[in-house]
Structure formats: structure tokens, C-alpha cells
Amino acid sequence: MGISVPQVTVKILSTKLAESGPLLITHWGLSGPVILKLSAWGAKELAAFNYHFGIVVNWLHTYNESSLKASWSQLRKQYGSQKIGSRNPFALPGRLWNYFLHKCAISPEINWADLSAAQQSRLIKILTGQEFQVSGKTTFKEEFVTCGGIKLAEIDVNSMQSKIVPGLFFA
């Protein structure tokens, strides 16, 4: 079963493309509305990259790295005596929060107040800018990444009928 995150920001590296929205983590990889929007809007760029490119996921779309650093001392004060594994102040799904702790080599049993500066830095960085490499596309859902379509010059805009194939109408 996948994990859904209601609101993230995803940016395609080496482009100006970024979108915010719901993200789904599946056993296939990342999906959901934010990924599908990016693959639609960035179809030409993704094809030019031969579907090999990097993305950055900001799991806390309302923060960037510097704003989260600025808020961190307040979080430590507020949750200082609580175990970081059981106190997730960002409303992220539990399995995802535990993954971040593991990835940052942070024991879920450590109290918020006892996080080292290095641990804090790693956690802030992953929460606001985790990088992934995309290598290819799925064979289904190709319509989101292939730049297909019909030239407007080939459609009678009054009737929405094809000028090339009489009797073929578009909605």
C-alpha cells in the first residue's frame, strides 16, 4: 500500500518547472497529481532529457531550508522532552517520518532536545529538498509525458471537426 502526502512541492532540476500538490509514493516510485502535472507541463524537456533527470521534493511545501532552520529552535522548545519518533510536528505520514529519521541516522528514541546540530541539519535538508534521480518512464500513462496532440490548424473551430478526417469530431 502506498503513502500519500497531501501537499509537497516538486522541482525538476535544470529547468524552471515546479509544481505543488498531492504526492503518492508507490512501490513503483513517485506518482500522484503533482508528478502527473509536471510530466504534462514538462513533456518536451523530459523527452529531451531522454527521461533521465533529477527532481527535488520539498516535503514541507510551506517551508524552505532557511525558514525551517529559523523555526527549529521553537520546535525543540515545544517538543524537547518528547521522542522524535513519536512526535512528528509536520503531519507527515508515520512511515515516511520514520524513513526520514532512518535516512538521517536519527534514533526514533532520541528526544527532540537531544538532536545534534548535524542531525538537525540532515533532517532539515531532507525535509525541504530531498533529491531523486528519475531514470525512465512507465509504459502506462505515456500520455502524460509524450507531447502528443493535434494541431489547431487541423480543426474547424466552429464545428470541432477534423479538417483532415471528415466526420471526426473533438470534444
Where are these regions (language model features)?
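A glycine-rich dinucleotide-binding beta-alpha-beta segment and adjacent secondary-structure elements
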Residues: 99-171
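An anion/pyrophosphate-binding glycine-rich loop and adjacent beta-alpha core
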Residues: 1-114
